[in-house]
C-alpha cells in the first residue's frame, strides 16, 4: 500500500490540490479545462466547502485565470476524499462556465439539472439536496 505523506504547509496543500486538479482534468475532462489558481481561504458563505470565482481575478504568465477556493474553515475536519469531491464539484462549474451552461439559480445557491448532467458525465455522483439542488 502506498504511504501517504502528511501535508504540513499551505504551499504543500495547494500543490497537492493543483496535482489533483490536473489529474481529474486529464482523466475526466480529457484535459479540456483551462488552468486555474487554487486557493485555500476562509469561507465566502457559511457552510460552503468551496467555490469558484466567476470573474478571472488572477493573472498567470500573462493569462487571466479563474480561482477555485477550498474553504479553510473545513480543512482538517473533512477527509481527503471529501475535499477532492469539493474540488470536482467546482470543476463542474468551471466546465459549465467554459461552455456557457447556466448550472445554478438563486444567486448561485441552487444547482440545477444542467449541473447534474455535467457532474455525472464527468465522474461526480450527485443527489438532490434540500435547498441547494443537485450536489454532493
PLM features: what roles do these ranges have?
Residues 85-98:
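Active-site recognition of the HExxH zinc-binding catalytic motif
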Residues 82:
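Glycine-rich, basic loop-to-helix element that forms the pyrophosphate-binding segment
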Residues 1-2, 89:
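Short, compositionally biased low-complexity segments
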Amino acid at each position: 500500500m502506498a504511504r501517504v505523506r502528511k501535508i504540513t504547509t499551505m504551499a504543500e496543500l495547494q500543490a497537492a490540490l493543483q496535482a489533483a486538479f490536473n489529474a481529474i482534468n486529464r482523466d475526466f475532462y480529457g484535459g479540456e479545462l483551462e488552468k486555474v489558481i487554487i486557493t485555500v481561504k476562509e469561507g465566502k458563505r457559511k457552510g460552503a466547502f468551496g467555490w469558484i470565482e466567476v470573474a478571472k481575478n488572477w493573472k498567470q504568465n500573462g493569462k487571466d485565470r479563474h480561482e477555485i477556493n477550498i474553504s479553510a474553515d473545513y480543512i482538517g475536519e473533512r477527509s481527503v476524499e471529501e475535499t477532492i469531491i469539493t474540488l470536482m464539484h467546482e470543476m463542474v462549474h468551471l466546465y459549465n462556465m467554459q461552455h456557457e451552461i447556466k448550472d445554478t439559480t438563486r444567486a448561485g445557491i441552487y444547482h440545477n439539472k444542467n449541473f447534474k448532467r455535467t457532474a455525472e458525465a464527468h465522474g461526480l455522483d450527485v443527489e438532490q439536496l434540500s435547498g441547494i439542488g443537485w450536489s454532493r
